[in-house]
Design a protein with these regions (language model features):
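Membrane-interfacial helix-loop segments of redox and metal-homeostasis proteins
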Residues: 2-143
Length: 143
């Protein structure tokens, strides 16, 4: 007797483009999330061990790698690439795992309303990443 019934296997279902919400697939999400976590971790380790005795203003320069890392983590967790948004494209089956113009599965966003939703989401993500990076850099610079 089966206790679990399988109605649909959601992991094998093809992803779908949703304006302002999803423009990358599973591989792109995984690579972006991993890249972001590694970049943030390496930046924190570098700050703790290499920049500890140096000037606090120099340590604030780590806001840039923090920004890139946080933005990559946001892209991975939200299934949304800001570069695809700026190009008005989406790619749910990225063969390389990053936004590339040479991808065979790259699609153009058709509607102007959809482009506007994508740009609004990208701007929000940039602001979240920037505020997180500045906050993290300030916290580490003041310690």
């Amino acid at each position: 007797m089966k206790l679990v019934t399988t109605s649909r296997n959601w992991s094998k279902m093809a992803p779908e483009y949703i304006p302002g919400r999803c423009n990358i697939g599973r591989r792109g999400r995984a690579i972006r999330l991993t890249t972001g976590v590694v970049l943030i971790g390496l930046s924190i380790i570098f700050e703790i061990f290499a920049l500890k005795p140096s000037n606090h203003l120099v340590r604030l320069g780590l806001a840039f790698p923090f920004y890139i890392g946080i933005l990559a983590c946001l892209e991975g967790s939200m299934s949304f690439c800001v570069l695809h948004s700026s190009r008005a494209t989406y790619d749910l089956h990225e063969p390389r795992g990053f936004a590339s113009k040479k991808s065979d599965t790259l699609e153009k966003v058709g509607s102007e309303d959809w482009k506007k939703l994508d740009r609004r989401k990208a701007l929000r993500m940039h602001l979240e990443a920037l505020s997180g990076a500045v906050l993290l850099a300030l916290l580490l610079a003041l310690t």
